[in-house]
Amino acid sequence: PEICFHLAAQSSVVISVEDPLLDFEHNLLQPIKLIQTLISTDCKKFVFSSSGGTIFGEPNIIPTSEEDFAGEPVSPYGVAKKKLNDFIKLMLENEKMSYSILNLSNVYGPRQDPHGEAGVMSIFTGKMLNNEKPIIYGDGNQTRDYIYVADVVSALIKSSENDNDLFL
């Protein structure tokens, strides 16, 4: 392939805590093997969909900026995603294949499962459509980034046109 878009992952934070070895296998080891295979081909670009919220940890100050985050993941899932970002940069540093990494947070859109552990937009919408009150954890002062799935598709395509970039 000329461009490889890698969006596959074991995406459950809960599973990553319950079975960190499984998470390591799916979110670090397999993508590294994929990159090694792609290096031996004529692939020119590797575009990776990482995870924003889980790799940066919780913000120290609200309202927040990028500098206000603790910078440390709080789950094996976040650790694997953060380390894979580092591996991509390291592995492709001296290769003919360039990369783009998109650290996406809380992607939402049509057909998203309202019964999963993540996807607060679909969970809240599903509850409201069923005349149920959404459950808010914490004190309600938490902050999160959200991005619509069509905007993610546009960002992935645009990122394939740039070399060796990290997008937050």
Model-derived segments and spans:
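NAD(P)H-binding glycine-rich loop region in Rossmannoid oxidoreductase-like domains
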Residues: 1-26
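Short acidic/polar active-site loop segments enriched in Thr and Asp
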Residues: 2, 44, 165
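SDR active-site strand-loop-helix element
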Residues: 4-10, 46-52, 102-104
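A short helix-coil junction within the Rossmann-fold of NAD(P)-dependent oxidoreductases
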Residues: 11-15, 37-45
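Catalytic helix-loop patch of NAD(P)-dependent Rossmann-fold dehydrogenases
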Residues: 18-33, 45, 54-101, 112-116
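NAD(P)-dependent short-chain dehydrogenase/reductase
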Residues: 58-62, 86-145, 149-160
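Mid/C-terminal beta-alpha module of Rossmann-like enzyme folds, strongest
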Residues: 161-168
